[in-house]
Amino acid sequence: MSPYFLNSKILSQQLSSQTTKDKLPEKYGPFYFDQPVDHFSSDTTTFKHRYWANTDAYTAGGPVILYNAGEVAADERSFYVINSSMAELARELNGIVIVMEHRFYGESMPALNYSAKSLATLNTKQALADIASFITDLKLPNLDIELPSAPETKYIVYGGSYSGNLAAWMRQKYPQIVFAAIPSSAPVQMSYNFYQYFDPIRRYGPDHCIQAIHSVITYVDHILFSSLQHPISALKNKFGAADLEHNDDFAERKLNQ
């Protein structure tokens, strides 16, 4: 597990706790941008693309630090506009920090159903075009002066994990409008069944911990790969997952907890 993931997980938990006590001031959003549903067709239909922006530190010539929240509802990360390394960087550079939601997450829904036709626009190509469109056409409602367009305004795209992939790919695909990218733990080379991700844990973790993990995996696999429904159901019940019919869904839920 990467240090970035651990740090961002801790920060997300802290900010989630913070949001239960505090409310992000309305001057930071959320705001909504009219985004094309399909950037690569003649259809002009748009959806409301949600984002937050902190312009407090901005002075003329400052950059925009743009973070696409990736595969979560972005309100979970809205506090990043005031409390994050991005916010610190924006203050240091007299810039703006923006958190934007990924299409099909949170309130940024190009469609109200999950049909195959609707989900055809849920892909990386469209997500990158969303960011490019956002950079090109953005008008910030909480900024009193006009923000010069890119490349006059330097856009720094930020992210970690999948969001980091987007940052790196934006710099590669749209260099004319993206000045720089700061991707962390970004596996930009796609790999099917990327078991190597877990290999450093096996190789460098404490022996007793690795043995315990191996024993648990072996035990659970023995149950899930059997044809005996009773022990499978008992295992799911123990983890509060009795509602999950498919074993791969059960494994995915436990992996992400």
Feature map (PLM): residue ranges:
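Catalytic-loop region of hydrolases
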Residues: 1-96, 107, 114, 121
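Structural recognition of the beta-strand scaffold that forms the well-ordered cores
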Residues: 65-67, 96-100, 156-158, 180-183
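Short beta-to-alpha linker loops that shape the active-site pocket of alpha/beta-hydrolase fold enzymes
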Residues: 71, 101-105, 187
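Glycine-rich "HGGG/HGxG" loop immediately N-terminal to the catalytic nucleophile
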Residues: 104-117, 136, 192
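Alpha/beta-hydrolase active-site loop
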Residues: 118-146
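Alpha/beta-hydrolase fold nucleophile elbow
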Residues: 144-162
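Gly/Ala-rich beta-loop-alpha elbow adjacent to hydrolase catalytic centers
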Residues: 159-163, 167, 171
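Alpha/beta-hydrolase
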Residues: 169-257
